Amino acid sequence: GDRDVLVIEGIHSLNDAMTYSIDKENKFKIYISALTQLNIDEHNRIPTTDARLLRRIVRDAAKRGTNAAKTISMWQSVRRGEDENIFPYQENCDVMFNSVLIYELAILKQYAEPLLFSVREDQPEYETAKYLIKFLGYFLGSSSENVPQNSILREFIGGSCFNVG
């Protein structure tokens, strides 16, 4: 009806070709991205890609039972998909939401480190795992005990009050 709302989520949702049958004035596009705004020091910013990979490693282990090596091995394919299906359309959004939390790397550390330490030296993903372990060494770990159940971080670490699959 006239007051119905259709929510389309996913990598193709900003692409107008996917919603060509909906008039432009009836669309409101929200782009959610994790844009890390922290620096390690005055000259070295934290790469957004590293923080996003850590999120994915933790989430894939918890939700899909995927080990860190497998997630790391798929990362370049994920990045190619973003380059083709997300980034060209991100400017088409009506509003952008940065989902990064200032404290998330301190929380993710406790979940990510054991997963990264499980990557063996003889695996091709070892160098990336070693790099991420060193990167996490810049942060003091923190308990997830005080992370609210409605926090977006719960999508990755579990314990959300929302059914996020």
Please give the residue ranges for each predicted region.
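Loop/turn-to-beta-strand initiation segments
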Residues: 2-6, 28
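Conserved NTP phosphate-binding and transfer environment spanning the P-loop NTPase/kinase superfamily
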Residues: 13-165
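Switch II (G3) loop of P-loop NTPases
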Residues: 6-12
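Alpha-helix C-terminal capping/helix-to-coil transition sites in glycosyltransferase folds
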Residues: 1-2, 92
